[in-house]
């Protein structure tokens, strides 16, 4: 049986908002079966709950943001990616601000928090969204596509005219599992170019950005003294983002995702396109130990 998962304990952390530069408190709490992932703006009175749902996405420039009843929560993609990577179905995320902390620019700190809180398997079958037929969305030369696949596979191509991002390091593909996610994807940091950061600062964005939480490039090189964590860290981070953006579809996915130069906007467009076409997907569970086993491997909680 592939069971739903939540946290075993509540855990708290503090960090800086990438765009606001403000100190942010985050609390991750267990949630009951079929609750899903829900963000709560506890700095507001009354508190506003914002479900992690693709149809609530309103911000897709530089991050993924959700809005409900006028309340926003931004930069959700890295935490959502960690939830997906560890197979967390149900959780409550309390926030003291409209933005999640950027941590080190990857999802690894969130993975560590979830590991520290412990993972609890619940007495209910995990519900997968299985892609039944191909769905593709485009925006100019950018493409994002889901196809049927017995498992969860992600392939991504980036294209940047920069000597540190050569063509041979512009494509990456992974067969999704908890172990592969933690080892191959979770450490990949967000990245940006010095000229873009200067433009963002002029618009009061990226105020919390630094080489402590992002890879920064000038026209020729990586400026971070410690260099890259992976030779192709840039494209791996795009997969990290995609895993988080796509988890807003409402559950773990069985299908193949292929993207060319996609980003938060196109990822959300793909999620909405799938959900709008009920013939392209179905819910499926694996409730019995004797029944067919799910083709996606989630590491046992005791081993994470």
From Swiss-Prot:
Catalyzed chemical reaction(s): a UDP-3-O-[(3R)-3-hydroxyacyl]-N-acetyl-alpha-D-glucosamine + H2O = a UDP-3-O-[(3R)-3-hydroxyacyl]-alpha-D-glucosamine + acetate
Gene3D superfamilies in the cross-refs: lpxc deacetylase, domain 1, lpxc deacetylase, domain 2
Active-site feature positions: 264
Keywords: Hydrolase, Lipid A biosynthesis, Lipid biosynthesis, Lipid metabolism, Metal-binding, Zinc
Pfam families assigned to the protein according to its UniProt record, in alphabetical order: LpxC
GO molecular function annotations of the record: metal ion binding; UDP-3-O-acyl-N-acetylglucosamine deacetylase activity
Protein residues bound to Zn(2+): 78, 237, 241
Keyword Secreted: no
Enzyme kind, highest EC tier: hydrolase
Record-level GO BP terms: lipid A biosynthetic process
Pathway it works in: Glycolipid biosynthesis; lipid IV(A) biosynthesis; lipid IV(A) from (3R)-3-hydroxytetradecanoyl-[acyl-carrier-protein] and UDP-N-acetyl-alpha-D-glucosamine: step 2/6
Keyword Methyltransferase part of the UniProt annotation: no
Cofactor entry: Zn(2+)
EC nos: 3.5.1.108
Cellular component annotations (GO), alphabetically ordered: membrane
HAMAP family cross-referenced by the UniProt entry: LpxC
Family the entry assigns: Belongs to the LpxC family.
Functional description taken from the UniProt entry: Catalyzes the hydrolysis of UDP-3-O-myristoyl-N-acetylglucosamine to form UDP-3-O-myristoylglucosamine and acetate, the committed step in lipid A biosynthesis.
Protein name: UDP-3-O-acyl-N-acetylglucosamine deacetylase
Species this chain originates from: Xylella fastidiosa (strain Temecula1 / ATCC 700964)
Lineage: Bacteria, Pseudomonadati, Pseudomonadota, Gammaproteobacteria, Lysobacterales
């Amino acid at each position: 049986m592939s069971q739903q998962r939540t946290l075993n304990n509540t855990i708290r952390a503090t960090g800086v908002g990438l765009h606001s530069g403000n100190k942010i408190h985050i609390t991750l709490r267990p949630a009951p079966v079929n609750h899903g992932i829900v963000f709560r703006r506890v700095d507001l009175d009354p508190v506003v709950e914002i479900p992690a749902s693709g149809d609530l996405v309103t911000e897709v420039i530089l991050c993924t943001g959700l809005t409900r009843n006028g309340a926003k929560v931004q930069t959700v993609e890295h935490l959502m990616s960690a939830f997906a990577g560890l197979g967390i179905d149900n959780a409550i995320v309390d926030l003291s601000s409209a933005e999640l902390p950027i941590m080190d620019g990857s999802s690894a700190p969130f993975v560590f928090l979830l590991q520290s809180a412990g993972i609890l398997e619940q007495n209910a079958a995990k519900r997968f969204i299985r892609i039944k037929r191909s769905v593709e969305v485009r925006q100019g030369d950018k493409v994002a596509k889901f196809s049927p696949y017995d498992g969860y596979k992600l392939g991504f191509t980036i294209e940047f005219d920069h000597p540190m991002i050569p063509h041979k390091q512009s494509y990456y593909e992974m067969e999704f599992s908890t172990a592969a996610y933690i080892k191959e994807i979770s450490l990949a940091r967000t990245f940006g170019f010095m000229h873009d950061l200067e433009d963002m600062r002029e618009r009061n964005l990226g105020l919390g950005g630094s080489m402590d939480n992002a890879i920064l490039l000038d026209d020729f090189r990586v400026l971070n003294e410690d260099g890259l964590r992976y030779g192709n860290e840039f494209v791996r981070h795009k997969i990290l983002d995609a895993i988080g953006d796509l988890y807003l579809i409402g559950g773990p996915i069985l299908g193949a995702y292929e993207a060319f130069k996609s980003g938060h906007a196109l990822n959300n467009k793909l999620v909405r396109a799938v959900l709008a076409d009920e013939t392209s997907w179905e819910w499926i569970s694996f409730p019995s130990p004797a029944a067919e086993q799910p083709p996606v491997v989630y590491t046992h909680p005791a081993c994470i």
